[in-house]
Amino acid sequence: MHSRDLIEQYKTYVQDWRRYFHKHPELSNEEFETTKTLAKELESMGVEVHVDTERGTGLIGIIHGAKPGKAIALRADIDALPVQEHNTFDFKSDVDGKMHACGHDGHMAILLGAAKMLTAMKDRIEGDVYLAFQPAEETGAGAPDFMQFDNWFEKIDAIFGGHVWIDLPAGLISVEEGPRMAASSKITIRVKGKQGHGAQPHQAIDAVVVASAIVMNLQTVVSRNVSALDSLVLTIGNIHSGSEWNVIPGEAQMGGTIRFFDPAQEDHYVESIRRVVEHTALAYGATAELIYEKKVPPTINDAAASELAERVVIDTLGKEKLSKMRKVMPGEDFAWYLQEKPGCFTFIGIQNPEVGATFDHHNNRFTMDDSVLSAASAVYAEYAIAWLKEHK
C-alpha cells in the first residue's frame, strides 16, 4: 500500500479535524485541551503517546515500524493567535479573541492524517516515526523549549515539517533546498532627551523629534549599508512617547524587527543599526539605547533532504504538484530543529478564491482550502517511510 492510495479515504477525516481545531483555538503555552484531544486521538490509533505533563501542553507520538532502524520526526505546531475572527462559516472560532489565523489547525490535521496512514502501513516502516505536536510556535521559543522534553530530539536522526501557505495555489507543494524563511529578531530602542514645556522647546530635548529622526535614518541601513544582492527587512512597528498635549516628552520607546537570511551578516546588521540609533540621538543632544533580541534563526533546508522531498512529492502526487516558490521573510521556529538535525520544511499551497482562501496569514478572515490537506498528509507519511528506507 502507498500513501497516495489513502488520500481520498482520509480526505474528510483530515478536513474534519482541521475544522474542529479551528473552532477550538488555544494560545501559545495554553494548548491544554488541544493536547488532550490529540493524545486521545493518537492513542485510539495505537500510537505510543508521551505528553509533556510538566507544562501540560505538547506531546510526542511514536509509531514503531515493523522493522528496526533509525528515527525521523514529523512536526506540527498547535497554537493559535490572539485575533478576533471575522469569518462567518459554521466552524469559526468559538473563543472570543482567539483564532487559528496562521494555519496551525491545518498542520495538526495534516499530521493526524499522516499518523492514520502510517499506522496502516507499519509493514513499510523501517524504524520509528516520531510525531511532534509542538506548542508555542508563535512565541519563537516553542521549539527550543520543546526540544528539551523527554529527550525525544536526541533520539531522532532527521525531521520534516511544513506550513500551509496562502500565496501558493491549493494543492501545490514547495520543498526547495537552502534558505526558505528568514531569521527573526526583535529590536527595542529607548530614547532619552529632556522633558519641557510645549511652549519652550529650546529648553527641552524633544524625544519625539529624536525618535522620528532615528526612524527615518534607519531606512539607510537597508539602502546604504547592505548589498543589493542580500535580503534585509527592518521595520519599526510602534512608537510610544509622551502623554500630554502641552508637554515635550523627554523619553520615547520604539519596537521593531529585522529579518534576514545570512547568519554571517547578522553582526554587521546589528552594528549598523546601533550606530545609526546612537549617533542620531547624539546629533540632537539626546542618548539612545538599542536592545537586540534574537527570536529565531533562518530556516534552511538540507540539500539532500529537499532532494528526497522532491522525489516523494512527484511519486505521491505527480510532477505537476511540485512547485518552485521564492523564500519568504516571515520567521519560523522550526529553524531551531534544522540547526541540529538534517531536514526539510515544506510550503503547502492552500489558496483558493472559490472558498474565500485569499486572506493573508494573521488576518482575521484567514482560511484555507482544506480539501488538499490529506494530500499533504500523504507526503508527510511517504517522506518518513522513504527517509528511513534510505538511511538504514
Regions found by a protein language model. Give the residues of each.
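Acidic/His- and Gly-rich active-site-bordering loop/insert found
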Residues: 1-100, 109-125
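Hydrophobic face of alpha-helices
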Residues: 14, 32-39, 111, 208, ...
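Divalent metal-coordination and catalytic microenvironments
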Residues: 21, 61, 74, 104, ...
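Active-site beta-loop-alpha junctions enriched in small/polar residues
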Residues: 26, 77-79, 136-138, 165, ...
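Histidine/acidic-residue-rich, glycine-tolerant segments that coordinate divalent metal ions
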Residues: 59, 81-83, 87-99, 105-106, ...
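Hydrophobic beta-strand positions in extracellular immunoglobulin-like domains
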Residues: 63, 191-193, 258
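Non-cysteine beta-strand/loop elements that form the S-adenosyl-L-methionine
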Residues: 73-75, 187, 345-350
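Metal-dependent amide/peptide-bond hydrolase catalytic core
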Residues: 212-392
